[in-house]
Amino acid sequence: MHSFASLLAYGLAAGATLASASPIEARDSCTFTTAAAAKAGKAKCSTITLDSIKVPAGTTLDLTGLTSGTKVIFEGTTTFDYEEWAGPLISMSGKDITVTGASGHLINCDGSRWWDGKGTSGKKKPKFFYAHGLDSSSITGLNIKNTPLMAFSVESDDITLTDITINNADGDSLGGHNTDAFDVGNSVGVNIIKPWVHNQDDCLAINSGENIWFTGGTCIGGHGLSIGSVGDRSNNVVKNVTIEHSTVSNSENAVRIKTISGATGSVSEITYSNIVMSGISDYGVVIQQDYEDGKPTGKPTNGVTITDVKLESVTGTVDSKATDIYLLCGSGSCSDWTWDDVKVTGGKKSSACKNYPSVASC
């Protein structure tokens, strides 16, 4: 028979065990109000709510190495103190991560503090969000305003970004530049669904990767839907890309593929489908193989092949001083193209097109 003392001791020990367990259980669902607390406590949480965090200057909101299956919720207004640095402002990695924005939330980067019209030159500006190694994961419903520079840098496998709003409209008059919305590289399986973007650079830029789908996009004020520049990276392959059911307005270009002069690589299995453009200032459709130091040279090379490219139902208007279609390929490097219902009007016809497949028109 147990003595009263031994039962009491057992009860106290059990209570101590429960007491020590309780904080761990409480951390299963965590609300953080500072970047430091989020970084320190993230590994112990299955659900992380980021409530109105003010991120200190020169600091990344560090959500890398999240436990598999973690849910992340942005709530309230997230802000960032000012410092000239490379960023990123937010970085996230892990597997099976679900990221959402609560109703009424805003991630306000207040990019005008950095904007000087010089983009990657001039002041050092932080990139916004690194989704590097954020595999088999999703980001849904984020509302983002005025990124200092590029918004999303995606280097992940099997990631889906849905209903993302990137509103850098203020940059049109306040010096926003190089504010790419989605830069994709070294990724297999990227889905970008129904984004709304107003920016001052590419709405989408794919530098390398495979199995990429972009659909339902609204792209305003930037440089259009781009593949490239391809070349001179560790990975110079872009394969199996579908860009469809999207509008591009008041932008420099609508549809663009560009490769680096003298580089090697490949661009293949590319489809642009049901793209509607308006108010395009430079080129409606542009495919060129002559980029060097970020600028076209007019002298295409053939080291990066562009094959199996399909344009279907690519329509709309460009400005009177713009060029409807410009195709500048290296010798033998552009082949196996399909064009169906490509109707771009309003601008000039180019006399400088070269080496493009006969099914295309220039």
Swiss-Prot record:
Localization, UniProt: Secreted
Glycan attachment residues as annotated in the record: N240
Catalytic activity: (1,4-alpha-D-galacturonosyl)n+m + H2O = (1,4-alpha-D-galacturonosyl)n + (1,4-alpha-D-galacturonosyl)m
GO annotation terms (biological process): cell wall organization; pectin catabolic process
Propeptide: 21-27
Main localization, broad class: secreted
PbH1 repeats: 156-186, 209-229, 238-259, 267-289, 301-322
Keywords associated with the record: Cell wall biogenesis/degradation, Disulfide bond, Glycoprotein, Glycosidase, Hydrolase, Repeat, Secreted, Signal, Zymogen
One annotated Gene Ontology cellular component of this protein: extracellular region
Presence of keyword Repeat: yes
InterPro entries in the cross-refs: Glyco_hydro_28 (IPR000743), Glycosyl_hydrlase_28 (IPR050434), PbH1 (IPR006626), Pectin_lyas_fold (IPR012334), Pectin_lyase_fold/virulence (IPR011050)
Active site (record annotation): D201, H223
Name by which UniProt lists this protein: Probable endopolygalacturonase II
The organism's taxonomic lineage, starting at the top: Eukaryota, Fungi, Dikarya, Ascomycota, Pezizomycotina
